[in-house]
Amino acid sequence: LTDCLTGAVQKGDNTAGKQPSMTIVVCIESGMLEPLTLRMVESLRRFGGRFANLEVIAVTPRSTPALTRETHRRMEELGIKHLRVFPDNPYVWHHYMNKAEAIAAVESRVTTEAIAWIDSDILFLREPNGLELPPGVDFLASAPDAGVIGSRGVTDPNDPFWERSAALIGRVADDLPWLQTGDGHRIRFYWNAGLYVYRRSTRFGREFLADFKTFLDRQVARTHSQVHFMDQVVLGLTVIRLGLAWQALPDSSNFPLCSYLPRNYDGAKVTGVSVLHFHDSMEPKLWNKLLETLVPGHPQIHEWLEPQGPVSVPSSIPSSLAREGLRMVRGARRRAYYARSGFIKAWSPAR
């Protein structure tokens, strides 16, 4: 955390030995999310220390073929609760709307002090102490990189988008706090939405979902990337709109390991990491690179992970056909939205 502007607070010590009052929320549906979610939760149960026995709720918030019997068996074995919800959402086609629906659905059903959203492409390498909300802090997240649509300021090509986005909460872009990314950039208030923790009493999940829909209603985005990654922009703007006290997580609590950040495949960089955001590193082409990176600092993770091999989609022709049908329908709805907004995936006017 660098520029600690309005709403930011300083880091404090955590209480050792006590399980946090926290619920973990994930999404699960037929396909790749099945093995990814199971592997993520197993890493939590094995290596999560005080966090290992937290309640995990896997939400299915949109239409999907049935989960496999093996997935249901492993969910029961790992103590994962499954929640099906059927929201009436016109933006079900959005790649990440399911995450917002999931967090809002769980928020109204649990009583823990904190709720943590965890993407399924994450591994817990050791006890993730940084994820516990300190007193007086309402929201935790990290900014490992500027991503595709982050803005470094007025000269950044993405900045007009940030001006339009800030306007929806009655601000201008220069009102937003600055963050220092893990790869050394100073950017506007743009969090990674793969892992965040918030105080349940703030009702952040409900407000985040409402803001997400509003941003799509108002057609703030003018490119495919702006639509695709909009949840990460809305995440921070909802924090600002609600006036929440926030704190940036260190990179070690959400460290990215992926093909587009090749320099992170470095055992020395990963040694101190407690939460690994591996993105595409479980694919066959990067599998050995992932294992080699884990050896120096996390031999126990390497030993557990190596026999499992790369992640693959459960084999089922009917499920594959059904998923493809849903993908085509959602793709058509997405293209219709782009057309109404005046652009297509491959081309857009000035941002």
Q: Where on the chain are the PLM-derived regions?
A:
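Glycosyltransferase catalytic domains, chiefly GT-A lineage
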Residues: 3-351
